[in-house]
From Swiss-Prot:
This is Osteopontin. Residues 49-63, 71-82, 228-243 have a biased composition (Polar residues). The gene is SPP1. GO terms for molecular function: cytokine activity; extracellular matrix binding; integrin binding. The modification Phosphoserine is found at residues 23-24, 26-27, 60, 62-63, 76, 78, 81, 95, 100, 103, 115, 118, 121, 124, 184, 188, 199, 205, 210, 214, 228, 233, 237, 240, 245, 256, 267, 272, 274-275. InterPro entries: Osteopontin, Osteopontin_CS. Extensively phosphorylated by FAM20C in the extracellular medium at multiple sites within the S-x-E/pS motif. The phosphorylated form inhibits hydroxyapatite crystallization. Dephosphorylation via a mechanism involving ALPL/TNAP promotes hydroxyapatite crystallization. Disulfide bonds: none annotated. Residues 1-16 form the signal peptide. Residues 38-278 are annotated as: Disordered. It comes from Bos taurus (Bovine). A motif (Cell attachment site) lies at residues 152-154.
Length: 278
């Protein structure tokens, strides 16, 4: 305890002592201060007029900055018209009302009767959309007309029957018609049926011509095939003969070469035997 008390006393004494400011100047500056104290004092303490000249541009710059800040802040406030502020207030009120309504709805949903009513209302709000009904293609059977005689074997007889029916109907429908009208009607129908008959005849003639041409072409094609087969067989026989002749020649040449080799060997053996005898 004594040591602690002594330490506190020393700290209090040290804090009570005056602190001398350290001179940050160099030794040359200290010498100048000692030699010319008045000149240094006047240099360190300039005239108030000089201070004002130095401070004037700084004050102008600071005033310009403050003016700019004020101008930037003022438009944001001025742009907000009283109507906009009123709208903002109304929005806040509406949001509060909505929140209150939500809370009321949450309270009322706890009632079973209310839940049933809401369910029925939701079902009534639903709209029944029509379902896609598959479209059925209606097939209309082909009803041949009276003048349609194509595709029948008895087209001529059928045409005569249809004409007689037409004439009977025309007589019944117009009993007052004259013979000239009747003849003109027949002529017009004949003119109308003439191109059909000619087309049928041309088709039949084309079919007959095509059948005749096909009959004529088939034997010619057969003859050509036979002739080509004969030529190929002759060429094959010639080639086979030439091949056999070449084989025979090669065999003869090979045999003659073997005979020559044998003769040479025999002559060499005889020479060697005669030399040994000598």
């Amino acid at each position: 305890m004594r040591i602690a008390v002594i330490c506190f006393c020393l700290l209090g004494i040290a804090s009570a002592l005056p602190v001398k400011p350290t001179s940050s100047g160099s030794s040359e500056e200290k010498q100048l201060n000692n030699k010319y104290p008045d000149a240094v004092a006047t240099w360190l303490k300039p005239d108030p007029s000089q201070k004002q000249t130095f401070l004037a541009p700084q004050n102008s710059v600071s005033s310009e900055e403050t003016d700019d800040n004020k101008q930037n802040t003022l438009p944001s406030k001025s742009n907000e018209s009283p109507e906009q502020t009123d709208d903002l207030d109304d929005d806040d009120d509406n949001s509060q009302d909505v929140n209150s309504n939500d809370s009321d709805d949450a309270e009322t949903t706890d009632d079973p009767d209310h839940s049933d009513e809401s369910h029925h209302s939701d079902e009534s709000d639903e709209v029944d959309f029509p379902t896609d009904i598959p479209t059925i293609a209606v097939f209309t059977p082909f009803i041949p007309t009276e003048s349609a005689n194509d595709g029948r074997g008895d087209s001529v007889a059928y045409g005569l029957k249809s004409r007689s029916k037409k004439f009977r109907r025309s007589n019944v429908q117009s009993p007052d018609a004259t013979e000239e009208d009747f003849t003109s009607h027949i002529e017009s129908e004949e003119m109308h049926d003439a191109p059909k008959k000619t087309s049928q005849l041309t088709d039949h003639s084309k079919e007959t011509n095509s059948s005749e041409l096909s009959k004529e072409l088939t034997p010619k094609a057969k003859d050509k095939n036979k002739h080509s087969n004969l030529i190929e067989s002759q060429e094959n026989s010639k080639l086979s003969q030439e091949f056999h002749s070449l084989e025979d020649k090669l065999d003869l040449d090979h045999k003659s070469e073997e005979d020559k080799h044998l003769k040479i060997r025999i002559s060499h053996e005889l020479d060697s035997a005669s030399s040994e005898v000598n």
